[in-house]
Each structure stands twice: as C-alpha cells, then as structure tokens.
Amino acid sequence: ILSSTSMVCLGSIFISLSNPIVILIYGRGSFNQNAVDVVSQLLIAYGIGMPFYLCRDLLVRVFYGIEDAKTPFRISIIAILLNLFFDWFFIGGSSPWGELSPLNLGVNGLVFSTTFVNFFACTLLLFKLNHKLDNLDLSNLLAQNLRIILIGLISGICSFFIFKIIFLPYSFINLLLKLIISSGISLIIFYCLAIILKIDEIDNLNKF
C-alpha cells in the first residue's frame, strides 16, 4: 500500500504538470514545442505506469523471500511474450501493406504496452501469492488502492489548476517556483485526503 501511495502521488504530479516539467528541464535550444509535446505525452504514460513497475518488483522480491523463484520466472516469460504482441498492437505505424495497427500510438504505444503488461503481471503475481499464503485480504487491498487512485486524481487535478492560476512573468526561476508551489500543495492535498479516507499506511506513519 505504501509503495502504491508514493507512486500514485508522484505519478499524479508527473501527469498533471508534464508539460511545464519538460519545458523546465529541456525547453531550450533546438528543443521546440513539438518535441516538448512528444516528451510530455511520454511522461504522462510513464506516470500512469509507475505504480505497476514498483509493485511488480516488490511482489517478485516477496516470492524470492518465500524461496519461490519459479513463479515470477514463469510470469516474466508470459509478460515478455505479451509485450512483444502489445508493442506491435499499440505502436502501429505504416508499412508497404498498410497500417500495422488500427491504434497507431507511435512511441507512446511502447510505454502503454509495458504498463499494461506490468499490470497484468502484478495481477497474476498477487493472485499466486494469495494462493500460496492464503491469508491476503485482497478485497481490502483493492479498496485501499481504489481510494489511493481517487486521491491521486483529485490531487493531480488540483495541481494542474493551481499551476494555471499562479501568474508570474515567464522565466526559468518563475517556472520552477510555480512547479514547486503547485506540486507542494498537491502533496498536502494528497496527504490530507489519505488521512480522511483512512489509507492504512498513512495512518501507521502518523503513529510514529
């Protein structure tokens, strides 16, 4: 839950503030607006996929901890094969025989493919782990994660509009200041909502 909370929190900021983040880091020289748009879309896609990347790694380590390396290995093989298919399906592009895929998402398709496969692998690993340990409260885990996603959506929307309403003359320092203020307020909103909606790990952290 703690890993999901941290990744959704960061992901919501990356998604809502993707354009100004890219402009701040790369927006100079020959890096034009078209390049900014492409990289911003990639940052959004990676923001969506961040929780699944981390959860998959954590679940694999849990299996290693209970001395089961076969299950994550088998699921990884399935994930690799699925990734090959979904790379083709999402990326698309033209060929002498026409469009390779009706979606034709280009470079963004590569990220969405990896995200989908990681989500699939996380789901399989979680069900296998529940079967092995037979004491995981999956319904509570699902409810907690749905609340975390809702909190991430709200805080992300807030950070987007806070950034928009802060008016400062354009400069590198002012852009950095706007990002710090909007993302900082977003973190506070996320934390407060996590307490209100009773996210377990946040409650545990508050006890220390």
Where are these regions (language model features)?
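Membrane-embedded alpha-helical bundles of multi-pass transporters/translocases
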Residues: I1-F208
